[in-house]
């Protein structure tokens, strides 16, 4: 285990205390960034809460902090430890059969890494509740964790990541027993890499990921697993370009449809054109934190 504590860092959002940590898993050093909560005292304080954000393809924890405009750092102001894990070779080994990246070829066990990371945070920081979220490949990693270790997770969220079709899912993932988890999905209708309506997903001709369900089918799948009280979701228009479908129940599911928005994390910034249109109508980190009750 290696820990490096840095002086307070001034970001576009606020001042944070950042720690770089590492642990050994599968004989490999796995690294991560921790953002400390603002008020981590009190036996029953929210500082016992961990929020893990998984980065997208060709990113790292450091890159995704900047990519998301440091907006997830702000969850530390809500009393959470925020952790950004680093994937191996800039990817996480998600559940898609079509993931043709080094992390798959190397047999990286990112589920085991997540388990070790949670144990580390429990041992060193007293974590008792764990929420997870991810973007793109990181969102796909969240979907895998929801299947394989659901009892470790108090709530999950994905951005720009539809569920892979059964034929594009690792067989071992589908064998796990269902366990309900509150879940929020966010998807743009103009996403060029993870099509809102489903189908072939990927980045360019060299990085295809196989077929996925539509955003609505993905959310409905988890609503059914959660025992939703309504088969058809209630629909609410939050703004001209944001529509929310909600399946109620003890473990609710929400699908936030971003009309005309691309493959990105809404965070009060403009993204490169190749990702599709940006939006200033919401901040994903705030929406997700509110859904989790943080």
Question: How would you label these PLM feature ranges?
Answer:
Residues 190-194, 263-265:
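Acidic catalytic loop of the alpha/beta-hydrolase fold
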Residues 275-294:
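Catalytic active-site module of serine/aspartate enzymes centered on a nucleophile-bearing elbow/loop
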Residues 208-242:
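Acidic, glycine-rich loop-and-strand cores that form catalytic or ligand-binding grooves
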Residues 185-187:
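Short beta-strand/loop motif that positions the catalytic acidic residue
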Residues 66-71, 166-175, 239-243:
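Alpha-helical scaffolding within the catalytic cores
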Residues 1-22:
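An N-terminal hydrophobic leader/cap segment in hydrolases
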Residues 23-36, 40-41, 45-131, 140-148, ...:
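Serine-hydrolase catalytic machinery in alpha/beta-hydrolase-like enzymes
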């Amino acid at each position: 285990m290696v820990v490096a504590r840095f002086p307070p860092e001034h970001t576009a959002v606020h001042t944070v205390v950042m720690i770089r940590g590492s642990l050994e898993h599968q004989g490999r050093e796995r690294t991560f960034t921790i953002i400390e909560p603002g008020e981590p005292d009190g036996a029953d304080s929210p500082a016992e809460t961990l929020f893990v954000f998984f980065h997208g393809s060709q990113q790292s924890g450091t890159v995704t902090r900047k990519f998301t405009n440091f907006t997830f750092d702000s969850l530390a102001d809500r009393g959470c430890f925020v952790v950004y894990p680093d994937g191996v070779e800039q990817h996480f080994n998600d559940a898609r059969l079509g993931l043709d990246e080094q992390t798959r070829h190397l047999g990286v066990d990112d589920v085991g890494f997540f388990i070790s990371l949670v144990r580390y945070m429990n041992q060193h920081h007293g974590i008792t509740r764990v929420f997870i979220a991810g973007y793109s490949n990181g969102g796909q990693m969240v979907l895998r964790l929801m299947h394989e270790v659901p009892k470790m997770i108090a709530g999950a969220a994905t951005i720009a990541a539809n569920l892979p079709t059964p034929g594009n899912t690792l067989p071992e993932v589908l064998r796990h027993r269902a366990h309900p988890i509150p879940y929020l999905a966010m998807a743009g209708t103009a996403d060029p890499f993870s099509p809102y309506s489903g189908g072939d997903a990927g980045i360019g001709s060299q990085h295809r990921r196989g077929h996925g369900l539509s955003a609505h089918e993905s959310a409905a799948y988890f609503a059914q697993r959660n025992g939703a009280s309504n088969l058809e979701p209630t629909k609410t228009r939050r703004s001209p370009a944001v529509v929310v479908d909600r399946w109620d129940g003890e473990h609710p599911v929400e699908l936030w449809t971003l009309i005309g928005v691309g493959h990105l994390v809404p965070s009060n910034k403009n993204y490169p054109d190749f990702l599709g249109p940006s939006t200033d109508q919401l901040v994903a980190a705030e929406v997700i934190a509110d859904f989790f009750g943080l």
